[in-house]
Amino acid sequence: MAGHNKWSKVKHIKAKEDAKKSKIFTKHVRAIMTAARQGGGNPDTNAALRLAVERAKADSMPMQNIQRAIDKATGNLDGVTLSEVSYEGYGPGGVAIMVECLTDNKNRTVAEIRHAFKKAGGSLGTSGSVAWMFEKKGIVVVNRSDKDDEVMETAIESGAEDIKELNEVLVIETAPEDFNNVLEAVNNIDGIEILESNVQLVATNESEVDDETAEKVEKLIEVLEELDDVQNVIHNMA
């Protein structure tokens, strides 16, 4: 009996580890697909894709999974036709939320997203209802280190618009057209770690909410991010 209990515990731990790995792989797939859609499927000429692939490999993601994500994003997967579509709405507390998707069935996708908003006490809006609160920016997130000054100087010289110095990371913001130049320049600095790099929507003004509402919004974002068709969820919660 003790042996059975021990095996049950091992299976439970393995299941948790598998779920964790699956979540990590899903995150990598989304990053790879976003980069490939934005800059093409060749890592040699697409710095964001090259970094996304390197991060996936570092987490032991199989190369066939990586290539499938690239092929899916660039329309090179037989029998699969994907469309980019964005949905927008209000979460708890009136927080504006944008949901970027890649789907082969818009009816299924919008039904799943509408259900998630409704269950959270929010509402899916019409096109343009919250999009005006966001703008496209290139974002490069770098781990802080003794190279911070060099990173910031290089980023500014190569076209960065703004740099936020947070506790553990530097967040570099660029115009979309300057993103690749800035990313390439920063990535050439030895001994730094780029955690995230893509062109994404950024809130132009933030919405303040209390802790209880913030928890509800975070739960909605988590539910949305678990949907297969969802690529990115962007909000304006402070």
From Swiss-Prot:
Matching entries from NCBIfam families are given as: PRK00110.1, PRK12378.1, YebC/PmpR family DNA-binding transcriptional regulator
Alphabetical list of HAMAP family matching this protein: Transcrip_reg_TACO1 (MF_00693)
Q: Which SUPFAM superfamilies match?
A: YebC-like
* Full protein name: Probable transcriptional regulatory protein NAMH_0626
Task: Tell me, in one coarse class, where this protein mainly resides.
Answer: cytoplasm
- What's the source species' lineage? Bacteria, Pseudomonadati, Campylobacterota, Epsilonproteobacteria, Nautiliales
InterPro entries given for it? Integrase-like_N, TACO1_YebC-like_2nd/3rd_dom, TACO1_YebC_N, Transcrip_reg_TACO1-like, Transcrip_reg_TACO1-like_dom3, YebC-like
Q: Which GO terms describe its molecular function?
A: DNA binding
Protein's GO biological process:
regulation of DNA-templated transcription
